[in-house]
């Protein structure tokens, strides 16, 4: 009886680990693939660093360290905090965990599909300087960001499925949502407004994040 009970516990533990880790591994693999595909060599410099050069040196170094590197890193680590509760010894596999794992996985699918659609659009030389406003991008200006936000809410959902997490950890995914809504999305919108003449009209008609029908 003891052996059977121990085997059952091991199976439940392995099931829990798989439900939590598979969407995270998928998410990490997507990021790694994106980096490999988009890497242009050591001489390439991200536009954010180029923009920083237009400010004074002290301000540039401050924004580089805190704004581009430290703060987002802290947010990511903070948003991973709910996993502590799902990996505790008292956590069990629940139907809600299955749903949360599926939600997390599908969020990564959403951003992966959005990335591929944008990549295919940019491959066509005829689209240079034009705005992508087809497929998922017809309904959201940043469907890839929507998927990323969904991923972090999925981490939160998996954490609370344990029944052990405090209520305040809702702040974890909300902090990531705020980062995208008030920083990442506006930054990309402003850059697109500067570089694409048709982006203003697209921006006025298209939802920032949620997949919604375009405005008339």
Can you say where each PLM-predicted feature lies in the sequence?
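Single conserved hydrophobic/aromatic residue that forms the stacking wall/gate
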Residues: 1-11
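Juxtamembrane helix-capping/reentrant segments at transmembrane boundaries
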Residues: 8, 44-67, 130-137
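Interfacial segments of alpha-helical transmembrane regions
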Residues: 18-25, 93-105
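Transmembrane alpha-helical segments that form the membrane-embedded catalytic/substrate-channel core
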Residues: 25-43, 73-78, 101-122, 172-192
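Membrane-proximal soluble regions of multi-pass membrane proteins
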Residues: 34-43, 127-134, 191-216
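Core segments of transmembrane alpha-helices
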Residues: 67-81, 144-156
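Solvent-exposed interhelical
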Residues: 126-149
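C-terminal transmembrane module of eukaryotic multi-pass membrane proteins
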Residues: 164-195, 200-207, 211
């Amino acid at each position: 009886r003891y052996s059977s009970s121990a085997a059952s516990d091991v199976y439940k533990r392995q099931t829990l680990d798989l439900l939590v880790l598979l969407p995270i591994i998928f998410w990490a693999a997507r990021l790694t693939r994106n980096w490999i595909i988009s890497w242009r060599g050591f001489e390439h410099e991200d536009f954010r660093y180029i923009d920083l050069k237009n400010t004074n040196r002290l301000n540039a170094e401050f924004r580089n360290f805190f704004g581009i590197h430290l703060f987002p890193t802290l947010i990511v680590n903070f948003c991973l905090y709910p996993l502590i509760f799902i990996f505790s010894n008292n956590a069990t596999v629940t139907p809600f965990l299955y749903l949360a794992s599926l939600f997390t996985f599908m969020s990564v699918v959403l951003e992966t599909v959005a990335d591929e659609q944008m990549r295919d659009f940019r491959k066509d030389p005829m689209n240079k300087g034009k705005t992508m406003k087809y497929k998922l991008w017809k309904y959201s200006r940043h469907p890839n960001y929507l998927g990323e936000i969904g991923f972090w809410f999925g981490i939160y959902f998996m954490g609370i499925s344990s029944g052990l997490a405090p209520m305040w950890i809702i702040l974890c995914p909300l902090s990531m949502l705020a980062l995208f809504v008030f920083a990442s999305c506006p930054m990309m919108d402003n850059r697109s407004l500067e570089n694409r003449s048709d982006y203003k009209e697209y921006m006025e008609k298209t939802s920032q994040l949620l997949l919604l029908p375009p405005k008339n």
